[in-house]
C-alpha cells in the first residue's frame, strides 16, 4: 500500500510543458539490505539516486487508472549521506493533445507532480515539504508536429542554476484500500500497483565513425548521456539509418541523406546532457559551433526485460541472422507497452500488438505485458462497443478492423496459457465489439464502409488510400466482412468455453449469414477468387486469406483460391505475413511462404539490424509486426506448437524442406521444449526434451503420427 503525499512546485505554472526538479538528502548509518520504493509522477519521472539513474516511469496507463512503480533501491544507497533526485515532466493545461504521444498516453490529473515512499529500514522517507524543488533552467521542451520527425520531443538545453525552494504538499496519495469508500466517493488521484517489471538498463557502445557520426551495431533505444567541453552549441541528431523512404538501400551507406530528430545543447565550459525521454537510434551525428567538443558518450539501452533462447540454430547462417534481427525488432518495440515502432509513434496498436504477443510467446513464458495490453484495449472501449485502435493515448483514433485483433489476443492467450478467467473477464467487451460490427451490416449482408480509417494493410496498390482497399464506387468492405466471419467464429469458441452457449450459437449464425453474403456478392467464378467489393473489379491476397482462414472456402477449393492469389498484384506485406503464412499452411502450400521469407532474408544484405515497417520504401526501420521469423522458425522449422495449455497438449511437427538440421528451445503452454533434428544419409533423427506431463502429438516428415507423454523422445526414420 502506497502511503505518501503528492508534492508540487509552489509557483508551478502549467501554461507550458516544463521539467521540474525535486531532491531530498538524507543520512543512513549503514547500507540497507533492502530499500523498497514506491513512486509515481504526473506525467513522467526520471529518478536518480546518488547520481545514478535508477528508474523512469510511471508505467503507461489508461484514463481509468494511474500506476505507481515499485523497486528496490538497496544497490543505489550507501552508509552516510544519500540523495534522491527526480526530474518530472509537467504538461501544460493547454498541451496540444492532437500529438500521438506516449507522454500524453498517461492520465493528467490535477497537475500534481511527484509522490515517493522509501523504506530504508532505519527510516521511512516520504514526499513532503522538507523536499526541495526547482523549475529546470536547463531544457525547453518542443513536441513534434506530426509523425514524421519521430522520437517524441526535442530538447534545447541551456546553462543556469536551479533556484531551489521548499516543495509544496498537494494531496495525499490514495492507493488500494482495505475499507469501503465513504459514500462511495473515489479520490481521482487513486493509484494502483504497476503490473509489469521495471525496464532493464544496460550500457551499449557507439563507435566513432568519423565526420561527427557515432554508429551502434544495431538499432537501440535508451538514454544517451553526452559530455561536452568548450563554448558554443552542439546539435545532436538521431536516426535509424542513412537514407529515407524510397532512397533507402544499404542502411549504412553514408552517401545517402541523413536526417533525424535532434537536441540542441548550449555549452559554456563543461556540460553533461541527457534527454528526458529515451532516444531511438542506430546512428548519432554531432554538429558543433564554436570550439565545442564531445568528450564522452554513455548510452544506456532501456526496455522491457524480455528473455529469449540463445542457443537456437536453424540450419544456416542467414536464417540465424534473420532470427537475431527479428528478436531485436521485437525487443525494440517492447517498452512499458508493446509499440508499433520506437522511433515514431511509440504507440500500442491492436494489430501490431496481437502479432507481437504471438512472437513473444515463442521466446519465454512471461505474459505480464500481454495481460496488460489486453486490459488496456478493454479499457479503451467506447459505449457503442468500438475499441481505440491504439491505447493508451489521449487522442482517440479508430481503425475498426483493429478491434478484431483484440479478440485474437484473448483467444491466443487462452490457447497459450489456459487462463479461462481472463477469457471470461473479456467476454463482455468482445460482445460489444461484435455488436458494433453487427450494426454496420446493411441489406446486402456485408459490412458497409465506416466513417473511420478502414485500414487493412500497407499494400502498394493501396498507397493512395492509405492502406484502405480500393473498392471503386462500392460502399462495402468485403475484406472486413470476411474478417468479421473469422472473428465471430473465434468468439463463439470463447463464449462456449465459458458456458455461454446461447451467445456462441448467435455468433455462429451471424457468421454463416455474412459468409453466405460474401459467397453470393463477392465470388468470381471466372477468376476463382473472392473480390474485394461487389463489382468484381478489385482482388487482393488479403481477401483470399480471410476467406480461407474463416472457412468461407475450404478443402481443395481453398487450396485453388490460394494458388490463384499468389500472382495477384495486391499482395500481403510484412504486416500480414503471419495470416498469409497461416492460410498457405492451412491448404498445404506452405512452401510458397519462401517468397516473403526471401524478402526478409534480403534485408540482411542491406545491413538492416531490425525489420522495417514495409518491404518497399519504409518509413520506420523497426516494426515488430514483421518479426514473423520468430514464429516460423519456432513453430514450423522446429515444429513446436501449443495445442491447448489448459489440457497440456503440444504438437511437434518439424518442417524439413531445404534444411538438414535445426535445434533450439521453444516456450509453450507446457513449459520449455528442446527440439533437435537432423538429416544424414537419408535418415531423419529427432530428439525432444519437455517437462513432465506434456501430452505430445509428434508428426514426422514421412507423415507418421504418434502420441506420447514421455518427457524425452528420440526417434529415427528413413526418408
Regions found by a protein language model. Give the residues of each.
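Hydrophobic transmembrane signal anchors and adjacent membrane-proximal interface regions, especially
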Residues: 104, 271, 704-706, 715-717
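Extended hydrophobic/Leu-rich segments
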Residues: 162-165, 170-173, 204-206, 445, ...
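Short, surface-exposed beta-strand-loop junctions and turns on beta-sheet-rich folds
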Residues: 53-55, 242-243, 692-695, 704-705
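Intrinsically disordered/low-complexity terminal segments and short unstructured peptides
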Residues: 4-7, 122, 460, 707, ...
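Generic structural detector for well-ordered beta-strands
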Residues: 25-27, 72-74, 215, 274, ...
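Active-site core of glycosidic bond-cleaving carbohydrate-active enzymes
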Residues: 348-364, 368-687, 692-704, 711-716
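Extracellular/oxidizing-compartment recognition motifs
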Residues: 1-340, 352, 368-373, 388-392, ...
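Active-site groove signature of glycoside hydrolases
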Residues: 344-345
Amino acid at each position: 500500500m502506497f502511503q505518501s503525499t503528492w508534492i508540487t512546485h509552489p509557483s508551478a505554472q502549467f501554461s507550458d510543458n516544463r521539467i521540474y526538479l525535486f531532491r531530498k538528502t538524507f543520512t543512513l548509518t549503514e547500507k540497507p539490505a533492502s530499500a523498497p520504493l514506491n513512486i509515481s509522477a504526473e506525467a513522467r519521472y526520471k529518478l536518480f539516486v546518488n547520481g545514478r539513474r535508477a528508474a523512469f516511469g510511471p508505467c503507461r496507463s489508461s484514463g481509468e487508472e494511474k500506476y505507481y512503480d515499485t523497486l528496490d533501491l538497496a544497490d543505489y544507497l550507501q552508509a552516510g549521506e544519500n540523495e534522491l533526485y527526480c526530474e518530472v515532466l509537467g504538461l501544460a493545461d493547454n498541451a496540444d493533445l492532437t500529438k500521438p504521444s506516449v507522454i500524453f498516453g498517461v492520465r493528467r490529473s490535477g497537475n500534481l507532480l511527484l509522490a515517493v515512499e522509501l523504506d530504508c529500514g532505519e527510516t521511512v522517507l516520504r514526499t513532503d515539504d522538507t523536499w526541495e524543488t526547482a523549475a529546470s533552467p536547463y531544457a525547453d521542451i518542443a513536441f513534434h508536429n506530426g509523425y514524421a520527425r519521430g522520437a517524441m520531443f526535442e530538447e534545447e538545453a541551456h546553462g543556469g542554476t536551479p533556484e531551489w525552494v521548499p516543495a509544496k504538499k498537494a494531496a495525499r496519495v490514495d492507493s488500494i484500500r482495505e475499507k469501503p469508500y465513504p459514500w462511495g466517493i473515489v479520490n481521482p488521484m487513486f493509484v494502483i500497483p504497476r503490473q509489469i517489471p521495471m525496464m532493464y538498463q544496460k550500457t551499449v557502445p557507439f563507435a566513432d565513425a568519423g565526420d561527427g557520426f557515432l554508429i551502434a551495431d544495431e538499432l537501440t533505444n535508451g538514454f544517451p548521456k553526452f559530455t561536452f567541453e568548450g563554448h558554443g552549441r552542439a546539435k545532436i541528431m538521431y536516426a535509424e539509418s542513412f537514407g529515407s523512404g524510397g532512397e533507402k538501400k544499404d542502411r549504412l551507406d553514408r552517401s545517402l541523406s541523413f536526417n533525424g530528430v535532434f537536441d540542441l545543447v548550449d555549452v559554456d565550459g563543461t556540460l553533461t546532457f541527457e534527454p528526458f525521454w529515451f532516444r531511438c537510434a542506430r546512428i548519432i551525428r554531432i554538429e558543433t559551433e564554436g570550439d565545442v567538443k564531445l568528450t564522452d558518450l554513455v548510452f544506456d539501452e532501456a526496455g522491457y526485460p524480455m528473455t529469449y533462447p540463445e542457443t537456437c540454430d536453424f540450419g544456416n547462417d542467414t536464417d540465424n541472422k534473420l532470427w537475431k534481427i527479428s528478436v531485436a525488432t521485437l525487443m525494440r518495440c517492447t517498452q512499458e507497452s508493446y509499440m508499433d515502432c520506437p522511433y515514431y509513434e511509440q504507440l500500442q496498436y491492436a494489430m501490431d500488438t496481437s502479432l507481437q504477443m504471438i512472437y513473444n510467446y515463442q521466446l519465454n513464458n512471461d505474459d505480464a505485458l500481454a495481460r496488460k495490453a489486453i486490459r488496456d484495449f478493454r479499457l479503451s472501449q467506447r459505449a457503442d462497443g468500438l475499441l481505440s485502435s491504439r491505447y493508451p493515448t489521449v487522442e482517440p483514433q479508430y481503425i475498426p478492423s483493429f478491434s478484431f485483433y483484440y479478440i485474437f489476443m484473448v483467444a491466443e492467450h487462452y490457447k497459450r496459457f489456459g487462463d479461462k478467467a481472463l477469457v471470461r473477464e473479456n467476454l463482455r467487451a468482445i460482445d460489444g465489439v461484435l455488436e458494433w460490427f453487427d450494426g454496420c451490416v446493411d441489406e446486402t449482408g456485408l459490412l458497409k464502409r465506416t466513417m473511420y480509417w478502414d485500414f487493412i494493410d500497407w499494400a502498394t496498390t493501396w498507397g493512395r488510400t492509405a492502406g484502405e482497399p480500393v473498392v471503386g464506387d462500392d460502399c462495402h468492405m468485403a475484406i472486413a466482412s470476411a474478417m468479421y466471419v473469422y472473428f465471430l467464429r473465434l468468439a463463439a469458441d470463447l463464449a462456449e468455453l465459458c458456458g455461454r452457449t446461447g451467445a456462441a450459437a448467435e455468433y455462429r449464425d451471424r457468421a454463416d449469414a455474412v459468409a453466405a453474403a460474401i459467397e453470393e456478392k463477392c465470388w468470381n467464378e471466372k477468376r476463382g477468387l473472392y473480390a474485394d467489393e461487389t463489382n468484381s473489379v478489385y482482388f487482393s491476397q488479403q481477401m483470399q486469406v480471410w476467406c480461407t482462414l474463416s472457412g468461407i472456402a475450404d478443402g481443395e477449393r481453398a487450396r485453388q483460391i490460394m494458388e490463384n492469389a499468389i500472382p495477384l498484384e495486391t499482395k500481403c506485406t510484412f504486416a500480414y505475413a503471419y495470416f498469409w503464412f497461416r492460410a498457405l499452411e492451412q491448404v498445404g502450400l506452405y512452401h510458397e511462404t519462401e517468397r516473403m521469407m526471401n524478402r526478409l532474408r534480403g534485408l540482411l544484405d542491406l545491413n538492416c539490424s531490425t525489420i522495417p515497417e514495409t518491404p518497399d520504401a519504409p518509413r520506420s526501420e523497426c516494426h515488430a509486426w514483421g518479426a514473423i521469423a520468430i514464429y516460423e522458425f519456432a513453430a514450423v522449422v522446429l515444429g513446436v506448437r501449443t495445442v491447448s495449455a489448459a489440457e497440456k497438449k503440444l504438437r511437434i511437427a518439424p518442417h524439413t524442406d531445404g534444411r538438414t538440421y535445426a535445434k533450439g528451445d521453444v516456450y509453450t503452454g507446457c513449459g520449455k521444449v528442446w527440439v533437435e533434428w537432423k538429416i544424414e544419409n537419408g535418415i531423419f533423427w529427432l530428439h525432444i526434451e519437455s517437462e513432465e506431463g506434456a501430452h505430445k502429438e509428434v508428426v514426422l516428415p514421412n507423415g507418421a503420427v504418434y502420441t506420447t507423454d514421455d518427457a524425452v523422445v528420440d526417434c529415427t526414420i528413413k526418408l
